[in-house]
Amino acid sequence: MAREFSLEKTRNIGIMAHVDAGKTTTTERILYYTGKIHKIGETHEGASQMDWMEQEQERGITITSAATTAQWDGHRVNIIDTPGHVDFTIEVQRSLRVLDGAVTVLDAQSGVEPQTETVWRQATEYGVPRIVFANKMDKIGADFLYSVQSLHDRLQANAHPIQLPIGSEDDFRGIIDLIKMKAEIYTNDLGTDILEEDIPAEYVDQANEYREKLVEAVADTDEDLMMKYLEGEEITNEELMAAIRKATINVEFYPVLCGSAFKNKGVQLMLDAVIDYLPSPLDIPAIKGINPDTDEEETRPASDEEPFAALAFKIMTDPFVGRLTFFRVYSGVLNSGSYVLNTSKGKRERIGRILQMHANSRQEIETVYAGDIAAAVGLKDTTTGDSLTDEKSKVILESIEVPEPVIQLMVEPKSKADQDKMGIALQKLAEEDPTFRVETNVETGETVISGMGELHLDVLVDRMKREFKVEANVGAPQVSYRETFRASTQARGFFKRQSGGKGQFGDVWIEFTPNEEGKGFEFENAIVGGVVPREFIPAVEKGLVESMANGVLAGYPMVDVKAKLYDGSYHDVDSSETAFKIAASLALKEAAKSAQPAILEPMMLVTITAPEDNLGDVMGHVTARRGRVDGMEARGNTQVVRAFVPLAEMFGYATVLRSATQGRGTFMMVFDHYEDVPKSVQEEIIKKNSGE
């Protein structure tokens, strides 16, 4: 089958925002206006097309990033709707990794909110061009210009309106297009009848002022335009649009639009802006990767003529077709039934069927081309972040960084029958979500699951019960502490056992030093002259890794430690891998006596929004929870407090804040970094874990 849409006419976009900014409703309207659905589903009624999981419909939030494809103005637009809740940041991150552009949705009453900052930062890291849609212009307190200002103040973004609203709140009835300098007036509830007319007299001065500001801001990014502007020459609409497109794609400029998705106003103009200003796969730099055979960097330009290269960005279990692997094609063509090489795992995979997804319904297709986003059935070994390439032209693309989980729960099956089902269910859920970990405590046999927050684990346990019919008891949430060394030391590990027959002998000297935060464990072999034979070196490293998994103070995994094996001895007959593994673990125990071991706890960046009258309460909450305030900001008659607070102190805070503010206060938190716990807290943790 020939390519239906050229690369120039393809857009891969994400829709991202703070929870409740109206992101899913915006996507729904896009699907409605592009003819994908015939009846609009409302999120608050639990009928949205994109939020297809039962829990999403009950909670009214988006959990997984559903992918869909739509058509507008002769273009194909592949859309990924991403969650706005911080516990699901990996969904946002892996979507951004495979997108070319994004629409950031703001609530026009609140402007930039905490999670907007998080997703904006992630999009900046990945260099994703963005347009901004100030939604909910019909809401009481909606303020378009405040929203634009918040983009400057909180994100330092070079964002400028290319539209202005006509009226706001109940009176929001149309939009001024600052490029055409025309007014678009909505005359029916479905937003399908739009009258283009002259700008109403009372808005002419404001429109002229903001058109001038727009031209000036865009001219700043384009030398030719700047010359024309300074010489007082007229700048045509085509020139202005071309310059906005160029600056947006270069991530130097962010066009801001307005509307109300719920009231069906502004969505078609936003779709026009997606086509006009966001990049096609040809407008962005060619993807880079490493050739696994030569270790050389290679590029894969977006072209059907190039060898096939794609990135798997999401795994999903579908009740009808089984395991689905979502992937983005960067170059080349792929047919169903063909073989690809998973270069990340070094395994050959067969593509059974290829599906084009629409939320959770699907259409089978024979071929995918460069720039497409699709799902494949039949891949057994591929997980999130793996590269899939032509077997003859191997390349490993940059993978997706996965944040470490910070919270854990114990789960136990209610019956023997549930036990087997639970193992399978947890394995499938972990395949889908790289931030969800499943471990078995070796000593107690308990199953421990870890994730990014209470809601994250709550949703996964709920899915285990609903989708896999597993009944399980769930323990209270626990913090994922870590351990480390704060001082350098040298330690000997000596293990000798003689008891008739073959003995055991291992002897090592290891220097331990603290490593940089986030660098993890690093092992260095500095043995000279074979005092420890080469074949036993891996056993020393393995012994350390295994021992560090259960810390030296309270049994938590050790991080950020360097170990240098520099001396030792061996016995010709009695030395073995096991003996050197044990010797290494004894060296770690010995080092703990002088290396100032410390317990680390996850620190959360907490953003609390509360009425001004409750500011004293909020500051008291932060202090009482061992937190420290990082900044404050007044927004109207509310105060926004940003603080770093240990996760251990945040359990149950929602209830405390609710009662202190009569339900008017809200908070969001996201993991920020690990920090040493105070000595008194460390002693309590050690005591608790030793069962005293």
Swiss-Prot record:
GTP binds at residues 17-24, 81-85, 135-138. Residues 8-282 form the tr-type G domain. InterPro entries: EFG_II, EFG_III, EFG_III/V, EFG_IV, EFG_V, EFG_V-like, EFTu-like_2, G_TR_CS. GO terms for biological process: ribosome disassembly. It comes from the Bacteria. Pfam families: EFG_C, EFG_III, EFG_IV, GTP_EFTU, GTP_EFTU_D2. Belongs to the TRAFAC class translation factor GTPase superfamily. Classic translation factor GTPase family. EF-G/EF-2 subfamily. This is Elongation factor G.
